[in-house]
Amino acid sequence: EQYAIVISQDCAENFAKHIKKFGAFSKMTLVNPEPIFAIVENGIPTFSQNAKENADDWQAVSIAQGNYWITHATQDLFQPQELRLHQRGGVDYDKGCYLGQEIIARLWFKASPKAWLHRVSEIGDLPNAGEKLEKIDVVNSIAMQNDEKGSFEALVVARPADLATVGLTVLGFPSALQQPVERAK
């Protein structure tokens, strides 16, 4: 069995060091990273080992679909539920043992996230990934092309009430990400 992991270059070395600790318990082998390029194919953000395109297009489509990307500036800042990873099948609450499972389970079964991923727009300076806009954490952002007003779109983690106080316009997500973030009781 083989798995391909796409990770930002600035996180690759730390990820390799971390995952190698678990290699002692399995027949895992890490291979050297290969260059991979972000592309948009049929309106879907994906990756290619051959085609190199404008990364801005990939970022804009990714943000519109609620697909965030983690970089060194944002690693370790967010919990999986805050990024809606459970709505994408990225967290399995019934699976056996994995690193961080007790924290994930505690949040899922005993509490609900207080802040979670939203797609927003605003006119103003483009915030950087990992930056705070008052009580709102920026995951990713991109300047809107062909916009004379200087607006941007961003994925942010925030409490819904905090979004209104900053004046951000909340935009929609695809239907898969419009489900309640908390566990149904």
Positions of the model-derived regions?
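Glycine-rich, small/acidic residue-mixed loop/short-helix segments
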Residues: 61, 67-69, 73, 83-90, ...
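Structural motif
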Residues: 101-102
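Acidic, low-complexity central loop/insert segments
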Residues: 1-68
